[in-house]
Amino acid sequence: SYSAHNAPLIPFYVYYSMFGFQRIGDLAWAAGDSQARGFLIGATSGRTTLNGEGLQHQDGHSHIQASTIPNCVSYDPTYGYELAVIIQDGLERMYKKGENRFYYITTMNENYEHPAMPEGVEDGIIRGIYQLQKSKSRAKKRVQLMGSGTILQEVVAAVALLQDDWGVAADVWSVTSANELRRDGLACERWNMMNPDKQVRQPYITEVLQDADGPSVMATDYMKVYSDQLRPFIPGTFKVLGTDGYGRSDSREKLRHFFEVNRYFIAITALKALSEEGAI
């Protein structure tokens, strides 16, 4: 509309996330090819979230498919303030700056507390990662826990398990977009290769984690490869939890246990990473 009719519109297309790239992938590619602008909202997203409808409707890979379209910018936010920041930035980029891009944003229908936005996190939300919680513990054993979407709630819950039962301090990071972090990492790698005489550029995720102590663990409601694409850019030990395999029909709690992405498996994985480093 903005090109053919000089009438900019702000389309929002809301659907079950499995019915997006899984069902209309050619149209999503055509949207990129034709330089469409707007927002795709993948609702009830994640393999353990649309929990009663089995493998047909449980989406564990839409963000992986979104990553194949160069001008599709994808996010997996957890909190309302993250969603607001992302949409505000998208409106500015598409309709004020005139950038030819469209957005894929996954959302849930799960009831949980939405905290106030921490001060100064807007840039991190847009670029793909920010620190949600920093442990006040002085414990020498420390881990970095990362997550997105609905599974970030399990990541937050794992903090108490590690602290109370094992004396391990845990910082929490919200990873709003692994895809955008990877694109940034690849862009830095290419720039460094093509400009050996200039100061090295650090990927954003490398920069924010370079002073963080201990191994990193990331859990999402998507296949492990979604998180694993960040491995080259994360300093130190990096462990990934995800929902590989077909979906199943059961409660969300049982599905998160089955796919090993709940708070207990996050804690176990963190302890295993500390063990591998000789910290415990």
Annotate each language-model stretch with its function.
Residues 1-8, 30-35, 67-69, 230-233:
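Alpha-helix C-terminal capping segments
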Residues 1-3, 24-31, 87-90, 270:
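Buried hydrophobic packing segments
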Residues 6-19, 39-42, 147:
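A short, small-residue-rich loop immediately preceding and capping a beta-strand
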Residues 10-15, 23-27, 31, 62, ...:
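Extended, hydrophobic alpha-helical segments in both membrane/secreted and soluble proteins
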Residues 11, 38-39, 170, 238:
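Hydrophobic anchor at the start of a short beta-strand
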Residues 30-47:
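A glycine-rich helix N-cap at a beta->alpha junction
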Residues 48-61, 67, 74, 82-86, ...:
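Thiamine diphosphate
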